[in-house]
């Protein structure tokens, strides 16, 4: 290959190194940790990682010599796998802790676990936990940098980041778009983080769902609230469906899953009320025939669901690389 030959992998790496910046805070616990310029910079960096991840050679040495520890106290496929891939592609030593085979299963508290792990000197800790505030608590007990991978019903900031990346790549922008977030908003940390980040990036957000699955005074989030799909989806550019989180429900929030799909499940008829060219999203895992019809979910002309999975790795690489720049005191 000549010196002037086109080399996409090298170009992606050069772009990444030019765009890496020190993360604005010590930890990434909330979508609210980012202002608009910082969020845009992180999305630009993630874009460069998308280009790299599509090459044969995908690895960098940004985290070489660093240890990334994944602490997933709740089951996860997409998030844990993407953080593991992100860490390895950046050159980190990745350790996955399984709570079922750890001292947590013997009754050890989260604080004691944090103190124990801190003694091992990990540089980065990615934590998912069923309790809201768990990531924040952990961040107060460790010297490493903590990334919140989902804490109870509170937040899931890297999901919001990958969703914003998916939207921006599909439309070329986020600002000025109308995003309808539909379904089980009450139990959704994804919804909370998305509302915050989408507002920061200039989108208009609606929440759509039955009254039983809508947080009290949700309007205080700066959103329009709708209890029927007809008005909620009217003119929306993006329709983001949420999983019905039956495992978090203690009581009869919906009459039945069949009844739920009839009124709130996304099918072609309901989608037709959205704006021409509207895109469909779902954070996964999907309950087909409950939140969304397979005909819609699997249609590449409207669905961004597989794009979201791909963007997850790139977005998390961007977060980890920025935290690494903070560790090194480098970046712009």
From Swiss-Prot:
It catalyses: carbamoyl phosphate + L-aspartate = N-carbamoyl-L-aspartate + phosphate + H(+). One of its GO terms (biological process) is 'de novo' pyrimidine nucleobase biosynthetic process. One of its GO terms (cellular component) is cytosol. Belongs to the aspartate/ornithine carbamoyltransferase superfamily. ATCase family. NCBIfam families: asp_carb_tr, PRK00856.1. Keywords: Pyrimidine biosynthesis, Transferase. HAMAP family: Asp_carb_tr. This is Aspartate carbamoyltransferase catalytic subunit. Its EC number is 2.1.3.2. Pathway: Pyrimidine metabolism; UMP biosynthesis via de novo pathway; (S)-dihydroorotate from bicarbonate: step 2/3. Heterododecamer (2C3:3R2) of six catalytic PyrB chains organized as two trimers (C3), and six regulatory PyrI chains organized as three dimers (R2). Catalyzes the condensation of carbamoyl phosphate and aspartate to form carbamoyl aspartate and inorganic phosphate, the committed step in the de novo pyrimidine nucleotide biosynthesis pathway. Signal peptide: none annotated. It is an enzyme of class 2 (transferase). Pfam families: OTCace, OTCace_N. L-aspartate binds at residues 106, 189, 243. Carbamoyl phosphate binds at residues 78-79, 128, 156, 159, 284-285. One of its GO terms (molecular function) is amino acid binding. The lineage of its organism: Bacteria, Pseudomonadati, Pseudomonadota, Alphaproteobacteria, Caulobacterales. It comes from the Bacteria.
